Structures are given as structure tokens and as C-alpha cells.
């Protein structure tokens, strides 16, 4: 079992020698809102930005416990994936190959909040929560390829409630009537002011 995982040695990410000019842009929101598309658009427009796709970690990392294997279905509820994301972020920062890390992820539980938002509090972070009217969100979910529609719809109320009750310092962007590029532009303008 590697460090930082359940039963292993807990890492202290705040005391690492982390790059001072690094920024993290958290693209947050419920499932199907367009986090990945917006994050990809941002990375195309910011030199030396790096996209770290949380969803891609499911291909790379496998469950380490029965609760991860058989527990809640959404990836952010699986501690081993959140721990893997922490490790990936730390590695990218320490390598120093980029100065802006863009991470689309639904930060919809206390473990994500603690490990990711609080865990990297010593790095300049910009947290954006994307929202949309419910009917528009349902349309987006139904029109996406490679989307687990049942998962997205099932956990939407829980995700929406968590995001509404946490992260009061995050910037909320209603994407209902916005294109992907216009959302990306608004985020970039916000962090460069």
C-alpha cells in the first residue's frame, strides 16, 4: 500500500516544498455540467497550463478496499481515487513543468474538501462552481456521449446540495446561456484581474 492511502502513512502536503508561482484552478459542479470541456478550453488559452482529469484516474488506479469496490458509485466518493488525485497534483507541482493546474472535479463531499481544498490551501487556488438551470443540465447530461446518465441524475440532488452548503468563497458561474468558450473566458479573466 502506498503512502497517503488508507492504512498507510498519511502525507503532510502542506509542508512539502511546493512551487511558489503555481496556481490551481478548480472547475467544480455537479455531474454533466461541463467541467471537463471548460477545463480543456482554459488549458488551450493559458500558456504552461496543465489539465489533470480526475475522471481519467479511474483508468489508472484500481480499488484498494471493499468499500471502494462496492460503495457509492460516483468517483469522488472513492477515497483511493481522491488520494490518487492528491498524489498526482503533488507530483505535477514538484516537477515544476507548469505554472497553472486546471482540475475539473466535483468536490461534493467532506473528504474531497479536506484532502483537496484544505490540503492545498498553501497554493494560490481559484475555485469555480459551474451551475445551470435543472432542465438545461438534464439536456446536457442526455446529450453527452460516454456519460453514465443514471449516475449523473441519481447524484445530482446530493451534489447540488453539497455545493450550495459549502465553498462560500468559490465563484459561482451560471452556465445556462453560455458557451464553453465564454465560460472559459470568464474564468481566465477572473484569475488575471
Where would I find each of the regions flagged by the language model?
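Hydrophobic anchor at the beta1->P-loop junction of P-loop NTPases
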Residues: 27
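ATP-binding Walker
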Residues: 33
Amino acid at each position: 500500500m502506498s503512502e497517503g492511502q488508507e492504512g498507510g502513512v498519511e502525507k503532510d502536503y502542506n509542508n512539502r516544498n511546493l512551487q511558489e508561482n503555481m496556481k490551481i484552478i478548480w472547475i467544480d459542479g455537479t455531474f454533466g455540467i461541463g467541467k471537463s470541456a471548460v477545463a480543456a478550453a482554459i488549458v488551450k488559452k493559458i500558456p504552461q497550463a496543465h489539465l489533470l482529469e480526475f475522471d481519467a484516474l479511474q483508468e489508472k488506479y484500481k480499488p484498494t478496499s471493499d468499500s471502494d469496490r462496492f460503495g457509492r458509485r460516483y468517483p469522488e466518493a472513492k477515497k483511493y481515487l481522491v488520494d490518487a488525485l492528491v498524489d498526482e497534483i503533488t507530483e505535477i507541482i514538484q516537477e515544476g513543468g507548469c505554472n497553472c493546474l486546471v482540475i475539473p472535479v466535483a468536490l461534493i463531499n467532506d473528504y474531497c474538501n479536506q484532502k483537496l481544498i484544505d490540503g492545498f490551501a498553501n497554493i494560490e487556488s481559484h475555485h469555480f462552481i459551474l451551475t445551470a438551470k435543472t432542465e438545461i443540465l438534464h439536456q446536457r447530461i442526455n446529450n453527452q456521449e460516454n456519460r453514465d446518465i443514471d449516475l449523473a441524475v441519481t447524484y445530482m440532488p446530493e451534489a447540488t446540495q453539497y455545493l450550495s452548503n459549502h465553498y462560500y468563497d468559490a465563484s459561482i458561474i451560471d452556465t445556462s446561456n453560455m458557451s464553453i468558450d465564454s465560460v472559459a473566458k470568464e474564468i481566465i479573466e477572473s484569475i488575471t484581474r
